[in-house]
Amino acid sequence: MNRVVVAGSFNVDHVWRVPALPQAGATLSGDYTTGPGGKGFNQAVAARRAGAGTCFVCALGDDLGAQLARVLCTADGIDLRDVVVQAPTGTAGIYVDAQGRNSIVIGAGANAALQPAFVAEAL
């Protein structure tokens, strides 16, 4: 089996589906969901589901977001190599309008602490 190593971000995504993207000063009502995200995590999941042995290297906080990452990686058979740092796990606030366009604000949190040395240690 091929092995893929992905180094990147894990975020807890907070998603609001709204009729239109918010303008400055606007208050909107929308449907809310939360779930996993982050470019690195999404790539690791895609690689694993395509059949590759997958190692995901990331930085996480010591919080519920980190617990979510661990549970999801275990469930998908992803070898998670996380480094716990003194910052919250990354988050993203995502607004998606009726046409599917989005606006995203991220709180990088622990993702900003990811270092090349973490990857070297995982290999």
PLM features: residue spans?
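Active-site-proximal loop->helix
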Residues: 64-76, 94-96, 100
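Glycine-rich phosphate/adenosyl-contacting loop at the front of the ribokinase-like
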Residues: 1-59, 66-68
